[in-house]
Amino acid sequence: MPDDFGNIMLKEWLKQRKLSIDKINPVDRLTYVGSRGMGALEYEPADNEENNNYNVNISELLEVAKRVLGDKREISYNNIDKDSLSDILRIGTSVGGARAKALIAIKFNSDNRIIEIKPGDIIQPEDYSYWILKIDGANEKTLGEGEGLGKIEYVYYLLAKEAGIEMSDSRIFEENNRFHFLTKRFDRTDKGDKIHMQTFGAIAGIDYKVQKASSYETLFRVMKRLRLPYYQFEQQYRRTLFNVIARNHDDHVKNFSFLMDKEGNWKISPAYDVNYSYSPGGTWTNVHQSSINGKFDNFTRGDLLNFGKIFGIKKANHILDEVITAVNQWSKIATEIDIPKKEIEARNKVLRVNNFNK
């Protein structure tokens, strides 16, 4: 179901149809999602229009996102026609999370350059692939505000890959001197076929809206129940260490997912929402949302290694050092991506690259 930013967009979509979000129930929300949601689950009868023929205007998408996030009682869309507005609101509702984002389908040319963008919540021709666009320049009150988050997330994508973490293909999309983060969907094949996906929170029955509701130990126990092979535990261990060292405190139960194939076999999804997410004064981001060894902060090297030992991780010492080495490239890679020096230095002061020395 839509959440956070998606609910804001849904509320505005309903408003355009002279309806109130207060008068719709959870079943109504599911019929609105219909066949357009993440993963493979579909809900019938679907209550939404499909228009796959129009091209997505990123500038208009950003403008709508900024307006609906502005908390204004009356929002004017005088420069956006009614059909475009409805389409923009629709593609912004079907993906979860707090940040402004949209589901899009992209057509690339032979040089791998974007030549056309269409709605990604429905099936497009075979020469399109399916992506999530995280919109730069909209107001994200929880995880940081203003422009520039797209570039920072891209740096974190590169750091995570350096740390041996499996990520979906990602890139920066520049538009009017804004830098949006694009990541390829792992719940769709290139042909648009759907792959069943469930979050850790959904499988374990844990509400992600409850702060500090879970632990990495619980995540690994769910993996055991799903009978995942050893290499996936090692992969998830790398992700755990990366979140700690790189200050990704947005490690709640919806930010870990599992994919199921047609034979019923589960695996962990590629890592996602891997980004700097730390604010000492933040309600959600002052500490981690998942604990290790009963702690949500102030971890020791012993905590991290003991956690690995409990779940049979081989060469945990070596893996920890590899992740530290990768995160230690923050300044170098951020400089290459043109992150402002002030931003680089501010994060350098709080990254935990020196906290776990032997």
Locate each region found by the language model.
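Phosphate/dinucleotide-binding and metal-coordinating scaffold of catalytic cores
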Residues: 1-253, 257-358
